[in-house]
Amino acid sequence: MKSSEIREKFLKFFESKGHTIVASSPLVPGNDPTLMFTNSGMVQFKDVFLGEDKRPYVRATSVQACLRAGGKHNDLENVGYTARHHTFFEMLGNWSFGDYFKRDALMWSWELLTKVYGLPGDKLLATVYIEDQEAYDIWTKEIGLPPERVIRIGDNKGGRYKSDNFWMMADTGPCGPCSEIFYDHGPHIAGGPPGSPDEDGDRYIEIWNNVFMQFDMAEDGTVKPLPAPCVDTGMGLERLAAILQGVHSNYEIDTFAALIKAAGRETNTKDLTNNSLKVIADHIRATAFLVADGVIPSNEGRGYVQRRIIRRAIRHGYKLGQKKPFFHKLVKDLVEQMGEAYPKLQADAQRITEVLKAEEERFFETLANGMEILDAALAGGVKVLPGEVAFKLHDTFGFPLDLSADVCREAGVSVDEAGFAAAMEKQKAAGRAAGKFKMERAVEYTGAGNVFTGYENLQEDATVVGLYFEGTAVQQLKEGQAGIVVLDTTPFYAESGGQVGDQGFVSAEGVQFGVEDTQKIKADVYGHHGVQTQGTLKVGDKVQAAVDGARRAATMRNHSVTHIMHKALREVLGEHVQQKGSLVDAEKTRFDFAHNAPVTHEQILEIEKRVNAEILANSDTQARVMDIESAQKTGAMMLFGEKYGETVRVLDIGSSRELCGGTHVSRTGDIGLFKVVGESGVAAGVRRIEAITGANALSYFQDLEATVHSAAATLKSPPAELQPRLAQVLDQVKTLEREINALKGKLASSQGDELLSQAVEIKGIKVLAAKLENADAGTLRTTMDTLKDKLKTAAIVLAAVNDGKVSLIAGVTADATGKVKAGELVNFVAQQVGGKGGGRADMAQAGGTDASGLPAALQGVAAWVAERA
């Protein structure tokens, strides 16, 4: 049974049991700082289990793309070398949110495995938590699994409820027993059943885990029943496919077999059992899906994990003899295997290929040199690679530590990781010393959330419900003190979604607090940061909160145009454009987006044309609040990987429709004018556009016009005729430059003739060292050519001094380079004038900063040549 059939049968089975099919969420969890990557199917439902989110369904099923390559799941060195270690894998799952429980979950598991997939029941066994009699009875009495094949697992991890069969989301909160289903590969495979001393063998392989969240664990370790128990299950697709396809290793299943064959093709490797091919096949899945989900190789966070995986794959290709970029060519093979199940992979194939190719080209520039250093370090029979060598490979040649460790492991050598960490910390300490900063203490607020009225009003009557000084709650702020004010109602927008927080004033009679920024303390609690400029502000005071209207209006213009620009970027550059970050304030909008090449001038003009056309249309802006499902049906653009609540705000502005909680203009015409003022790259595969609107855009054009008028006046030309006048001036400049060069040639010839008489003959070589007056580098070279031609066998040094800096050139005729080298000669002189240089044996150049040493240096040339001739 193909992997595609396994996916399809799983989803259809649970759909027939009343489950809603939910699409795989991105590998980057939305708004979850505790996770680097989505590592299980339940991640996208975490807030549902915690009671912080509601869904329009109580039963769900999905096939979730997962990644484990960091933190406690960092088994990267095992990937490709064992039968079941992967970076990327797929998790089949079904969930109940307070609906069905143990009986249905286990009965359906058995039905799917034995009836739909056709696994023999006598090859399956299960584990249950030792105190979970209910699950034990379901297995033995209702499903009919013999008691000897239902294994009770106790607290085997050193504490109460610390067990392989008791699941906890965290130290406190939802938890409960679980029941795992294992497949017996047969007695010809080494290993014992779960719970036995030999359980780590490969005979019994876990394929499905049913977690029953029925308790709430308190801090003291006691548990009480949850009001609505839930079910969370997960089954690894690759493990199930291996069983259904009659193979023992996951790397032998259909999808991996195709990718391994492709890796062999691109590396010219015929032995398809080579572990390096398995590494490459695994890593193309992980890296391609990461790019599709917006993770670009970089030197920090998720981007660095991506870089580590890519470079590990490249190194294994290099090990197989591939010395040119190859890895990116596997994307098309991956799309053939998984594109139907994951349409985004197919849609983004070209961009994925380009990103991987760019990273390959970058690493191949340093890979060979780095491998030479690493091979040399290992050649002496060392047992441990020094930490400073590992750090040099990391810092200079881009070798992640685990890549160096991989190479060392193959040679039976360990890495001094402590030494590496010390070298890394030394570099970080230097960086910290160069740019120290002070971080505010976190503010803790336990009161009710505030009401935000800033969509409709810029002023609001409010009550002070919280005050903070240096991060600590206080009852009052005195004049001159900096602090944070919390109000029960506020028109101030708190920084979110790239839009900066509002500024303004909180005031009462004889009292004023200047708001310099507004930040969220919690999702629904806004902190007004600023300084008490007059009187004393107290908790409980009745105040008026007033936003700086001009600043808000300018910020709204820039935020609104960002939406229209985003749409124009996708239209002009392609649908692959994804927002990677933004900053919207009163001065400008700064928008980072996924794109592999600089945006051309012509493309910028087209983007400006489209955006300004939307502004001129002066259409109404419409904001609607609706549930997330309805919003999706409207076709509103959702930021990939962003986490949205049960209700969202859909913003229609011009022809753009996005989810956004920011503040915006009422009509597109309120934006006034749009101009792109900057385009640059901020990381591999990420571009940045900066743009201005309204009065700032008008000022930009007025300044530009003033510059044009000034230039026209200087050139005595009407502004409209400035371009042809400039062309005329440039032609005149070129003519003058040609005349100057001709004069320099005559001067060089004249000076050369004068210098001929100064040459002295030393052992058959005519030696000349002289300083030329008013000569530039070009004149020195021209004069050198003239002298070499006339002196025949010669060694010559010419010098010039301009603005206190010394320019040197040394020339040796071809018949004399066997005795005298121009590079050595010019360095001899340069060292005496505070400089250095180099070049070919017949011609070399140098510079210096100490002109006072030049006479003696030139005088010493004859003796230097005499020693070598």
UniProtKB/Swiss-Prot annotation:
Gene Ontology terms: biological process: alanyl-tRNA aminoacylation; negative regulation of DNA-templated transcription
Binding site for Zn(2+): H559, H563, C660, H664
Main localization, broad class: cytoplasm
UniProt GO molecular function: alanine-tRNA ligase activity; aminoacyl-tRNA deacylase activity; ATP binding; tRNA binding; zinc ion binding
Keyword Acetylation applies: no
Gene3D superfamilies: 2.40.30.130, 3.10.310.40, 3.30.54.20, 6.10.250.550, Bira Bifunctional Protein, Domain 2, Threonyl-trna Synthetase, Chain A, domain 2
UniProt entry keywords in alphabetical sequence: Aminoacyl-tRNA synthetase, ATP-binding, Cytoplasm, Ligase, Metal-binding, Nucleotide-binding, Protein biosynthesis, RNA-binding, tRNA-binding, Zinc
Reaction catalyzed: tRNA(Ala) + L-alanine + ATP = L-alanyl-tRNA(Ala) + AMP + diphosphate
Enzyme Commission identifier(s): 6.1.1.7
Cofactor(s) this protein requires: Zn(2+)
Subcellular location: Cytoplasm
InterPro entries in alphabetical order: aa-tRNA-synth_II/BPL/LPL, Ala-tRNA-lgiase_IIc, Ala-tRNA-ligase_IIc_anticod-bd, Ala-tRNA-synth_IIc_core, Ala-tRNA-synth_IIc_N, Ala-tRNA_ligase, Ala_tRNA_ligase_euk/bac, DHHA1_dom
Similarity comment: family membership: Belongs to the class-II aminoacyl-tRNA synthetase family.
Domain notes: Consists of three domains; the N-terminal catalytic domain, the editing domain and the C-terminal C-Ala domain. The editing domain removes incorrectly charged amino acids, while the C-Ala domain, along with tRNA(Ala), serves as a bridge to cooperatively bring together the editing and aminoacylation centers thus stimulating deacylation of misacylated tRNAs.
NCBIfam families with a match to the protein in the record: alaS
Function text: Catalyzes the attachment of alanine to tRNA(Ala) in a two-step reaction: alanine is first activated by ATP to form Ala-AMP and then transferred to the acceptor end of tRNA(Ala). Also edits incorrectly charged Ser-tRNA(Ala) and Gly-tRNA(Ala) via its editing domain.
Protein name per its UniProtKB record: Alanine--tRNA ligase
UniProt organism field: Herminiimonas arsenicoxydans
Gene name for this UniProt entry: alaS
